[in-house]
Amino acid sequence: MDEKDILRNLREEEEEEEENQSEETKILISSLPWEIDYLGNKLFKYQGYWYYEDVLQSIPNIHSSFQPQETDIVVASFYKSGTTWLKALTFALVQRSKHSLEDHHHPLLSHNPHEIVPYLELDLYLNSSKPDLTKFLSSSSSSSSPRLFSTHMSLDALKLPLKKSPCKVVYVCRNVKDVLVSLWCFLNANKGVEWGDFSQNEKIIRAENYSFKAIFESFCNGVTLHGPFWDHAQSYWRGSLEDPKHFLFMRYEELKAEPRTQVKRLAEFLDCPFTKEEEDSGTVDKILELCSLSNLSSLEINKTGSLGGVDYKTYFRKGQVGDWKSYMTSEMVNKIDMIVEEKLKGSGLKF
């Protein structure tokens, strides 16, 4: 048997394995409880969290094939919590010896952070159990270390691969009220995008404008993609308390209030602390400027580029803390505050 035949047989075996795994997952999904979300898509509840069917199918792929290296870094978040910013900061930090912050060809000047740091469940393992990890900029070279990945999944969903081989995980948490407002604005800025389960032929609901009230009620009920929000946040909060060497819990509000302190904290956690020479030469401030909302949003790639039908410019809005005050009624505020207080009781986590 020549080399071509061996490779062909290996591919056929892999395809058969993926088909069998996909069928097993479909059988599992058919037995799960489900609800209709504010986008008109089915959400399935699996091990306490809500997923679209196609995202749910990526979980077995991640569990069976994702093998973290000790030097890997996973940027984790609930969506609309500062993910884009944290991806940019993390890449700039760990790659600063390779990519000078003053280089006019720095990758962040020509690539959106979501291109550079791929999602495990969306970009890599959504349709494959053995994705090509080398096609992404942050892991394109065999000598590229650390590799950078991201996820919106809870820590509970990632425990299996991380147990086999722990790596560094950075989680950014944001006040749920600002998450709600940011999500609503983001969805309405991308009205032409078919959100949700792309394997679903028809949405049950179609709307020109996404209802803020509907999104609010879904969050309050905990029925939202990767939700409930409070369980998601608590999974990483517990991880940071139990294993601070591998899990860092960051708050968006603290990043905004004291960016220099928080970026230095992030660098320490990622084992790439700033030297005295770097601090004296303003390296911290250069990273903050490179990754700032004003700088990233002004770049041509982020003004005109897109990925998956989503315009990059819609990832950059106000980035303000407390913007929810312009959108939420006092009744809404009281309701969600009471729910969050109750759900977080005894955890030590507060907003």
UniProtKB/Swiss-Prot annotation:
Q: Which UniProt keywords apply?
A: Cytoplasm, Transferase
Q: Per the entry, what induces it?
A: Up-regulated by trans-zeatin.
Q: What class of enzyme is it?
A: transferase
EC code:
2.8.2.-
Record-linked InterPro entries: P-loop_NTPase, Sulfotransferase_dom
Expressing tissues: Expressed in roots and leaves.
- GO process terms (BP): response to cytokinin
**Transmembrane intervals:** none
Subcellular localization, per the record? Cytoplasm
Q: Where does 3'-phosphoadenylyl sulfate bind?
A: K80, S81, G82, T83, T84, W85, R174, S182, Y252, R317, K318, G319
Q: Where is the composition biased (Acidic residues)?
A: 12-22
Name the domain of life this protein comes from.
Answer: Eukaryota
Q: Where is the composition biased (Basic and acidic residues)?
A: 1-11
Record region (Disordered): 1-24
Please list the residues that make up the active site. H152 (proton acceptor)
Record's Gene Ontology CC terms?
A: cytoplasm
Q: A Pfam family name for this chain?
A: Sulfotransfer_1
Q: What does this protein do?
A: Sulfotransferase that utilizes 3'-phospho-5'-adenylyl sulfate (PAPS) as sulfonate donor. No activity with brassinosteroids.
Protein family (similarity comment): Belongs to the sulfotransferase 1 family.
Q: What name appears for this protein in its UniProt entry?
A: Cytosolic sulfotransferase 9
What organism is recorded for this protein?
Arabidopsis thaliana (Mouse-ear cress)
Q: Which gene encodes it?
A: STO9
